[in-house]
From Swiss-Prot:
SUPFAM superfamilies: Dihydropteroate synthetase-like, Nitrite and sulphite reductase 4Fe-4S domain-like. This is 4-hydroxy-3-methylbut-2-en-1-yl diphosphate synthase (flavodoxin). It catalyses: (2E)-4-hydroxy-3-methylbut-2-enyl diphosphate + oxidized [flavodoxin] + H2O + 2 H(+) = 2-C-methyl-D-erythritol 2,4-cyclic diphosphate + reduced [flavodoxin]. HAMAP family: IspG (MF_00159).
Length: 355
């Protein structure tokens, strides 16, 4: 059984709350030029449609910080400003409406710089994420531990956390990202045992859609199974829409997301008479807008379905130029192969409308 989630401090980010008993939220990051407000808003809107809960944007300069105000006018989810090197960009982002600031303790600079960011965040009532990245750990910490270790990553985070606490600031979120899955898992486990601040989970530089999905599913999924984590981001090279889809699938696979259609399908074999791959892909695409929790099966033959997919709410199983639609393991109707997809989608829509 999945372990009971650790109760962390509740923190408000724009119109969302994280930590405490709040749902685990899916975050992504735009890969547009933040200066280009139109393209950035367009991408965020697409991510919102996919179920993205929080969005982060890069703020490499003042122009990007000023763009936040205009971007915020057109989106519905909280916006996080991603800050590196220049603390003044954090302050400008806060002034222009950012709902949260992410800073990297390894490159933000001196204590007085962080103090100025904290003062601005306090004034606006927004949280700060201490986003540790293994690639930019402080030299003294690397020397102390002889390289990148879970203890080194956590110490870097806690060093900044203690500074924020000393300044009377407690609206803190922590992330501890490395590209090494076991190391990341151990770092989050260690941090979870030491603090009660919300943890943002992710594997940094995870890779392309296939390899990145696997690494993220193992890393994020393992931690969530242990009851650790309050927000997640699946870092993938490519369209960030995939990050949201994979993130939501991870939550759904663990029973932590109780909305949307889950499509299950057989791996196919020599008995298969229908194009399972095409059908399953199309069902997934055309049901992605549905919020009602449903499990839909696409099975290649009557051996795998309906019997082996009887836990599905509805499904199809292929035959010779025809197939069956089944509900909860019982055959509902026989349909010609060319009509299988449309008939299945009609039945799904009926189920969505049912109370």
């Amino acid at each position: 059984m999945i372990k009971m989630r650790k109760l962390t401090r509740e923190i408000k980010i724009g119109n969302k709350k994280i930590g405490g008993n709040n749902p685990i939220l899916v975050q992504s990051m735009t890969n547009t030029d933040t200066h280009d407000v139109e393209k950035t808003v367009e991408q965020i809107k697409r991510l919102e449609e996919e179920g993205c809960d929080i969005i982060r944007v890069a703020v490499p300069d003042e122009k990007a910080a000023y763009s936040i105000k205009e971007i915020k006018k057109h989106i519905n989810i909280p916006l996080v400003a991603d800050i590196h090197f220049d603390y003044r960009l954090a302050i400008k982002s806060i002034e222009n409406g950012a709902d949260k600031i992410r800073i990297n303790p390894g490159n933000i600079g001196r204590e007085e710089n962080i103090k100025k960011v904290v003062e601005a965040a306090k004034e606006r009532g927004i949280p700060i994420r201490i986003g540790v990245n293994a690639g930019s750990l402080e030299k003294e910490i690397l020397n102390k531990y002889g390289g990148i270790t879970p203890e080194a990553v956590v110490e870097s985070a806690l060093k900044s956390v203690r500074l924020l606490e000393k300044l009377g600031f407690y609206d803190i979120v922590i992330s501890l990202k490395t590209s090494n899955v076991p190391l990341t898992i151990e770092a989050y486990k260690l941090a979870s045992s030491k603090v009660d601040y919300p943890l943002h989970l992710g594997i940094t530089e995870a890779g392309t859609l296939e390899s990145g999905t696997i690494k993220s599913a193992i890393g994020i999924g393992t931690l969530l199974y242990m009851g650790i984590g309050d927000t997640i981001r699946v870092s993938l090279t490519g369209d960030p829409v995939h990050e949201v889809r994979v993130g939501r699938q991870i939550l759904r696979a663990l029973g932590l997301l109780k909305e949307g259609v889950e499509v299950i399908s057989c791996p196919t074999c020599g008995r298969t008479k229908i194009d399972v791959i095409k059908l399953a892909t199309e069902v997934e695409r055309r049901t992605s807008h549905i919020k009602k929790p449903l499990k839909v099966a696409v099975m290649g033959c009557v051996v795998n379905g309906p019997g082996e997919a009887k836990e599905a709410d509805i499904g199809i199983a292929g035959g010779d130029r025809e197939g069956v639609i089944f509900k909860k393991g019982k055959i509902y109707k026989i349909v010609k192969e060319e009509h299988l997809l449309e008939e299945l989608l009609k039945e799904i829509e009926k189920m969505v409308k049912e109370e």
